[in-house]
């Protein structure tokens, strides 16, 4: 059975190659199934990668995105390809994290969004970057992001 509401999607159900850059990646959205309810959608990307803009060395992060939809939800295959497009993108941790959050906010206009990017150590120092659009709506169930602080071998 084909649902014509999804015919405009360019990637879901089709062979898609990894975009060359985040700017070239196409993020897609579909209508939210339940408007007016404070339900949280969570995406976890435990193997996010990008490149240091200075050295070109790989950086790795565990990224958790939580949002409360309004009219739209992100199509998950397009999000997977978007996040994968950072693999050859050179930017500092903070820039990558905020670029992801801002692109999703622009696309979805969610009721609320937060991102936690838990970057693995480079030079012995882990960098964690957090951002959210504001206070979450009252009554929303927001589980902890579930990523323990980095401890190394200790």
From Swiss-Prot:
HAMAP family: QueF_type1. The active site is at residues 52, 59. Catalyzes the NADPH-dependent reduction of 7-cyano-7-deazaguanine (preQ0) to 7-aminomethyl-7-deazaguanine (preQ1). Pfam families: QueF. GO terms for biological process: queuosine biosynthetic process; tRNA modification. It comes from the Bacteria. Pathway: tRNA modification; tRNA-queuosine biosynthesis. Substrate binds at residues 74-76, 93-94. GO terms for molecular function: preQ1 synthase activity. This is NADPH-dependent 7-cyano-7-deazaguanine reductase. It catalyses: 7-aminomethyl-7-carbaguanine + 2 NADP(+) = 7-cyano-7-deazaguanine + 2 NADPH + 3 H(+). Signal peptide: none annotated. Its main location: cytoplasm.
